[in-house]
């Protein structure tokens, strides 16, 4: 661990964080998780209004901190958490747009892999293409927990894109034919940072919009009603923490 803290983006000490951090994009969702699911929640970061909290879930320490939007933003926060604060696990909890007929509004997509149109991996100077994938242990645990709560969920590839507004409206058709389930903007960078740091990451997304049916949820719904995804992530953090304590 590099002793480079507090950082320009996280005004905390390593002991302020639990080993597992839940990472929504929206700072208001971070606050929502802390206030509705954690006990003894303490604000540990508010630099640039990126709220971070640590509290207890079923007696186990869990942290939740926002990432902001896009790969550059989650790239900064996840890098600092993995490398400067020695966090072991980051679980992204966010929204995604469905791009497959089998996926429905408010379904959950667990990102086994994350395709991307970003050049984030160029920094590694690899002699080929890198395939960003989730931590198997986190993913396996999340799947078990999703089944236990009876969630409508899917496991497969996400598309992490750099562009929310794309000049070509049909660009997702090419990804759809490869079986990609949903599009979001963060998972690939998170998975690559985890791989490089030899740490663990997982993205659990709730479908907020549908690119085929044009259905959508409101910003308030995205902030306050995607609780099933939050519960799956918290239960995953709980099980992983217990396992590592034994």
Language-model features, listed with the residues they occupy:
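Metabolite-binding pocket within alpha/beta catalytic cores that recognizes anionic/polar moieties
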Residues: 1-137
